[in-house]
UniProtKB/Swiss-Prot annotation:
Keywords: ANK repeat, Cytoplasm, Nucleus, Repeat. GO terms for biological process: ribosome biogenesis. The keyword Cytoplasm applies. Its main location: cytoplasm. It comes from Schizosaccharomyces pombe (strain 972 / ATCC 24843) (Fission yeast). PROSITE patterns: ANK_REP_REGION, ANK_REPEAT. ANK repeats lie at residues 1-31, 35-64, 70-99, 103-132. It is found in: Cytoplasm; Nucleus. It comes from the Eukaryota. This is Ankyrin repeat-containing protein P16F5.05c. GO terms for cellular component: cytosol; nucleus; preribosome, small subunit precursor.
Length: 146
């Protein structure tokens, strides 16, 4: 198997080929093509939720946030194409919506300029929840008089 098989399987949602790759050599899921795109980039760009769900458990945070030669992450592609469910999966796996590409555009920006409202709502909810978690610790400290 080579990286082209992985890219094809993820771009075309060929789950049979993807299962074969996972069974024979799951470490291949981290590989990237000559443009820096991974299978996760392809599946995210094309809205293949089942593929993203299948491969995320094999990927670490570094791979989930990997940038291609244009600086785009899988989150950039999912956001600009309006794939909110994929953005949610990426966020839950440690994806960072603030990473900027070489044009200084983040996934949040890409979703906003393309009027991807579901994605924007998801990012807003994520930021609010993240802020709440951070503030909860501060509130407890305040209550304890620290």
């Amino acid at each position: 198997m080579d990286v082209d098989d992985l890219i094809y399987a993820c771009r075309a949602a060929d789950e049979e080929l993807l299962d074969e790759i996972i069974e024979k050599c799951p470490q291949e899921l981290s590989r990237r093509d000559e443009n820096g795109n991974s299978g996760l980039h392809m599946a995210s760009a094309n809205g293949h939720i089942a593929v993203v769900q299948k491969i995320i458990p094999y990927l670490n945070k570094e791979v989930i946030n990997a940038q291609n030669e244009s600086g785009n992450t899988a989150m950039h592609w999912a956001a600009l194409n309006g794939h909110a469910e994929i953005c949610k999966l990426l966020l839950e796996a440690g994806g960072d919506p603030h990473i900027k590409n070489i044009y200084e555009k983040s996934p949040i920006y890409e979703a906003d300029i393309r009027n991807q409202q579901k994605v924007m709502d998801l990012f807003l909810d994520f930021e609010i929840a993240k802020g709440s978690e951070e503030n909860t610790g501060d509130e407890e400290k305040l209550e304890d008089g620290i």
